[in-house]
Amino acid sequence: MEKFGLKALVPLLKLEDKELSSTYDHSMTLGADLSSMLYSLGIPRDSQDHRVLDTFQSPWAETSRSEVEPRFFTPESFTNIPGVLQSTVTPPCFNSIQNDQQRVALFQDETLFFLFYKHPGTVIQELTYLELRKRNWRYHKTLKAWLTKDPMMEPIVSADGLSERGSYVFFDPQRWEKCQRDFLLFYNAIM
């Protein structure tokens, strides 16, 4: 084990081991001699008040190279924007909510839940909320969860008309799944 320890490394650093000195690249262990580079920069070898790192950027810095402008092309879709490159095309509609409403109607429930939770306070959240309402999903304000009536069971309305008991399907955003359970629902707790 000693041959892999620090004791075996000391003769290598001091260049005492003649066997290894012929096959081992000592610049990998000891580093490179920077005195010639310091001399080319006009720095005396034993200057204590000047540090090399203050003037040396990087050995890979290409300061003499002129900047080359890369080849590029302008896509045709960019040239068709009004006011850009003298285009006369009618302006595109970037904020069209009507197109987004049609797209949102095609999504599955799980995708709508993802959009609802991913984009809080945006138009996308409002559109997904409206679409989920169309699909009979309601948001429970206290539980902070979405629920809908189980289509196979009709809930029983209470005598006072303020609540109903039945089987509901809840969407659990933590486990990202729909789960069914019996529940007493108060109407004032849902949106």
UniProtKB/Swiss-Prot annotation:
Pfam families: NOT2_3_5_C. It comes from the Eukaryota. The keyword Cytoplasm applies. Gene3D superfamilies: CCR4-NOT complex subunit 2/3/5, C-terminal domain. The keyword Cytoplasm applies. InterPro entries: CCR4-NOT_su2/3/5_C_sf, Not2/3/5, NOT2/3/5_C. Keywords: Activator, Cytoplasm, Nucleus, Repressor, Transcription, Transcription regulation. It is found in: Cytoplasm; Nucleus. GO terms for cellular component: CCR4-NOT core complex; cytoplasm; nucleus. One of its GO terms (biological process) is nuclear-transcribed mRNA poly(A) tail shortening. Acts as a component of the CCR4-NOT core complex, which in the nucleus seems to be a general transcription factor, and in the cytoplasm the major mRNA deadenylase involved in mRNA turnover. NOT2 is required for the integrity of the complex. The NOT protein subcomplex negatively regulates the basal and activated transcription of many genes. Preferentially affects TC-type TATA element-dependent transcription. Could directly or indirectly inhibit component(s) of the general transcription machinery. Forms a NOT protein complex that comprises NOT1, NOT2, NOT3, NOT4 and NOT5. Subunit of the 1.0 MDa CCR4-NOT core complex that contains CCR4, CAF1, NOT1, NOT2, NOT3, NOT4, NOT5, CAF40 and CAF130. In the complex interacts with NOT1 and NOT5. The core complex probably is part of a less characterized 1.9 MDa CCR4-NOT complex. PANTHER family: CCR4 NOT-RELATED (PTHR23326). Belongs to the CNOT2/3/5 family. Present with 2120 molecules/cell in log phase SD medium. This is General negative regulator of transcription subunit 2. It comes from Saccharomyces cerevisiae (strain ATCC 204508 / S288c). The lineage of its organism: Eukaryota, Fungi, Dikarya, Ascomycota, Saccharomycotina.
